[in-house]
């Protein structure tokens, strides 16, 4: 899985967790939010929890007191099996709350490592969970690469949220232009061009080391910046890896090289970087619209066709709306013992006819139930597909959700769904043969 895909999936999981946590309402101050930085000692955290457990004795309501102390005990038990705080720290949520039906009591114990290192300790017992650190994670998720170059050297860095990192830098000694004539001037000009050429080649090589990981670019976009024409020459240079060139989002002039140039490039590129995600989304969905307009059979859209194509292994890139609401079920027939899968809308999931076998007059048992997006995240690689998320915050994204069901696939080979549908109706296809 490439870095971009991995970050998109992590982002989706964090958004879902935020939604779940923010719906929870505890009994009194029974919901624990705990943030632990990477170098903190677990023994010190345990002592804080022990002190909080003692203070909870002063809570007048016995029900609230028990809920708070139970949450503290569960938190301590969870920490007891953690040998060491992960490199980026730890975020823990624990407590019991009343479900949306206002009757069922639910318990949550969620532990996750932040995407980046945290440096503060935070402990809160309240009637709601403190989710701001998770929201900060989402805002800081996208990483961008920077190459700053001038006649004195180059700097390679990344920007992620407000955190900048210098990956590599080196100096260069390029000869200045020679003002004299004659043979020496020609030799000097050749030497100057050769050194400039070698400089460009070295920058391109270092860029690969900094921004290519597992044969893929490890940043969402790349900014080329510098004084004079160096940055433009690099963009056009044959040595610059095509994968890196494809990720260049802007080329900007800065007045300085080195770290000062890096800071200025960050400041001047903010608007372009904010638009990168939506540009990628727009291009992806526009490509779908163009293929559909040409009646292409190398794309599919809508739940039924896309799931068929995925199970066939025909989907190269699966595109889904981040808030897709379908539910995936695995069902078992208690009479025949056969298992089957079905994907339903939330409304369909409340209708009993989808869980009945009329032939055997029995009700199908639900073996597994997942949000479809969750199931796709866990299984898309098994079908050889890539996974892309889109929002409905752009005009194209909104049209994709409303007109195409929020799910589509770009296919690795042509699939004739009309012919498949006809064969299924005529009984030519064996459903156990994965549509092949």
Curated annotation (Swiss-Prot):
Role: Directs the termination of nascent peptide synthesis (translation) in response to the termination codon UGA. In L.striatus UAA and UAG codes for glutamine.
Name listed for the protein in its UniProt record: Eukaryotic peptide chain release factor subunit 1
Gene: eRF1
Location of the protein in the cell: Cytoplasm
A cellular-component GO term for this protein: cytoplasm
Family per record: Belongs to the eukaryotic release factor 1 family.
Pfam family name, one: eRF1_2
InterPro entries: eFR1_2_sf (IPR042226), eRF1_1_Pelota (IPR005140), eRF1_1_sf (IPR024049), eRF1_2 (IPR005141), eRF1_3 (IPR005142), Peptide_chain-rel_eRF1/aRF1 (IPR004403), Ribosomal_eL30-like_sf (IPR029064)
Subunit architecture: Heterodimer of two subunits, one of which binds GTP.
Chief subcellular location: cytoplasm
């Amino acid at each position: 899985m490439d870095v971009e895909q991995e970050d998109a999936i992590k982002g989706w999981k964090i958004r879902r967790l935020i939604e779940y946590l923010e719906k929870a309402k505890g009994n009194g101050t029974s919901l624990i939010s705990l943030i632990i930085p990477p170098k903190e000692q677990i023994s010190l955290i345990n002592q804080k929890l022990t002190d909080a457990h003692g203070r909870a004795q002063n809570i007048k309501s016995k029900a609230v007191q028990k809920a708070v102390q139970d949450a503290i005990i569960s938190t301590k038990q969870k920490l007891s099996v953690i040998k060491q705080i992960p490199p980026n720290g730890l975020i823990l949520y624990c407590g019991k709350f009343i479900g949306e039906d206002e009757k069922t009591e639910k318990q949550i114990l969620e532990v996750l490592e932040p995407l980046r290192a945290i440096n503060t300790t935070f402990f809160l017992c309240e009637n709601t969970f403190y989710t701001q650190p998770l929201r900060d994670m989402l805002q800081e998720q996208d990483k961008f690469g920077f190459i700053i170059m001038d006649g004195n050297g180059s700097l390679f860095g990344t920007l992620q949220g407000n955190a900048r990192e210098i990956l590599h830098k080196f100096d260069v000694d390029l000869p200045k232009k020679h003002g004299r004539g004659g043979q020496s001037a020609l030799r000097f000009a050749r030497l100057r061009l050769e050194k400039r050429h070698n400089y460009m080649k070295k920058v391109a090589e270092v860029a690969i080391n900094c921004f290519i990981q597992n044969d893929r670019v490890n940043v969402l976009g790349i900014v080329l910046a510098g004084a004079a024409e160096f940055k433009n020459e690099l963009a056009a240079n044959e040595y610059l890896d095509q994968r890196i060139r494809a990720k260049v989002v802007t080329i900007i002039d800065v007045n300085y090289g080195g770290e000062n140039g890096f800071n200025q490039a960050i400041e001047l590129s903010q608007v372009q970087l904010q638009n990168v995600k939506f540009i990628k989304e727009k291009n992806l969905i526009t490509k779908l619209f163009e293929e559909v307009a040409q009646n292409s059979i190398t794309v599919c859209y809508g739940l039924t066709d896309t799931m068929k194509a995925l199970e066939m292994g025909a989907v190269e890139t699966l595109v889904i709306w981040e808030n897709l609401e379908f539910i995936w079920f695995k069902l078992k027939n208690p009479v025949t013992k056969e298992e089957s899968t079905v994907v339903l809308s939330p409304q369909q999931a409340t209708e009993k006819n989808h869980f009945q076998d009329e032939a055997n007059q029995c009700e199908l048992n639900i073996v597994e139930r997942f949000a479809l997006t969750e199931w796709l995240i866990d299984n898309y690689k098994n079908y050889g597909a890539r996974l892309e998320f889109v929002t409905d915050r752009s005009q194209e994204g909104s049209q994709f959700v409303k007109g195409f069901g929020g799910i589509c696939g770009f296919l690795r080979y042509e699939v004739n769904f009309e012919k498949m549908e006809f064969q299924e109706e005529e009984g030519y296809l064996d459903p156990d043969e994965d549509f092949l």
